[in-house]
Regions:
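N-terminal nicking endonuclease/strand-transfer module with a His-rich metal-binding environment
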Residues: 1-204
Length: 204
């Protein structure tokens, strides 16, 4: 299990990317959420209303206008060998545990599973302004994230790849070797999140 963390100011860009509306068409599924209104389809599956979710995230962010970048995006992936046992339930359990230990259990978040690459992974949009209007502590978040990933990987029996160095936080080598399509998805997401903040091509 490994996590890439990015920060931004556009909930719209992040949510639309995760829900498959930006970049190359993707197969995705909403598998979990917290603190936001959710619609359901006739089969009882999550059927999020995108604009309602965006409005909800933005409304909570306004509780603390000092936080200029309230969008936290977590791209969470696992070793390909875990795919056979990584059901939506197991993935959601691991993600919720990760968010709790990172301090994001008292805020809004949306968990979306993407099925367009060879490594099982999901994306999480979370509000850096919690339910009480406080900014969630992000001090040394990447170091803490790596430690938490290692703990959850061990506790839940996920697969480790070959290790390189302690500096790389013992993240599986196989999971670092992103496929071409995975890299395209990440670029599309980052561009989508940056567009609302850019005033010119140079800024972008």
């Amino acid at each position: 299990m490994m996590v890439k963390i990015t920060t931004g100011s556009s909930f719209g860009g992040a949510i639309k990317y995760d829900e498959g509306l930006l970049g190359k068409e993707q197969v995705y599924e909403t598998i979990g959420f917290e603190g936001i209104d959710m619609d359901y389809d006739s089969m009882g599956r999550f059927a999020p209303n995108l604009q309602d979710m965006i409005d909800s995230f933005e409304l909570q962010a306004e509780l603390n206008p000092k936080v200029s970048q309230p969008v936290k995006h977590f791209a969470i992936s696992w070793h390909p060998d875990d795919a056979v046992n990584l059901t939506n339930k197991v993935m959601t359990e691991a993600v919720r545990q990760y968010l709790k230990e990172m301090g994001y259990d008292n805020t809004q978040y949306l968990i979306t599973r993407h099925l367009g690459t060879d490594n099982p992974h999901c994306h999480v949009v979370a509000n850096a302004v919690d339910n009480d209007g406080k900014k969630i502590n992000d001090y040394m978040e990447r170091k803490r994230s790596a430690d938490i990933c290692k703990k959850i990987t061990n506790d839940m029996g996920f697969t480790w790849g070959s290790h390189k160095s302690a500096r790389q936080s013992e993240i599986p080598t196989d999971c670092r070797q992103r496929t071409y399509e995975s890299a395209r998805y990440e670029i599309a997401r980052d561009v989508a999140c940056a567009i609302p903040e850019a005033k010119s091509i140079k800024d972008l």
